[in-house]
Amino acid sequence: AHLYEYELGAPALLAGALVRPVPAPGGRPDLKALEEALRRGPFQAPIGLLALENTHNLAGGRVVPLEVQRRVQDLARARGLPTHLDGARLHNAAVFLGVEAREVARGFTTAMVSLSKGLGAPVGSLLLLPKELEAEARRYRKLLGGGWRQAGVLAAAGILALEEGPKHLRRDHEMARALAEGLFRLGLAVDLGAVETNMVYLEVEDPEGFLQGLRARGVLAGRVGGRVRFVTHRDLMD
């Protein structure tokens, strides 16, 4: 999960928390492995939070089904644990599932949504939480240097992104599917079954050389480990 792989060990550094990943083949948590991980003995660190990512970046932008989310929430609830949804691309999941965005976030104690990915805002994200946690969240935001001044202009862009951005996501998904199918027809190693939203991962022998070739042709993509990642978005032409 992004929370585990890409945040510089921040949970340990800032909160003294140990993050324990659970297998999630195809981005879907292995419920049996999760249930086993939740069984803690007297010599193991206690669990304080269960976090889930949807859509799942490293799995190729795949979507966790709502029934799987509900099962994860049930497991946490049975043990008195709060839950957090890393929903940076929550609206992509909602479009794929054919539901309102609120349905993807439903049942979690807290959730995060990015405004600057598929929704198209220049910057920003939202923390969704119950009213009783708001004061504490604002205190920690200030403590960690996250307070802004004169943020109204960017907030206006964020509101517009929330209102207008979701309309464009289905097209993003369709472009990703078309791209994946085109790469597959060229004989390149792409898993068509993993293309559910707006990401396409490509297995190549020389990722850096491949990316240089793309840049020479005016195409920008990224490298994730030994793979090349394409992300489709509203600023691309058909």
PLM segments and residue spans:
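Conserved PLP-enzyme active-site core in the AAT-like
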Residues: 1-217, 221-236
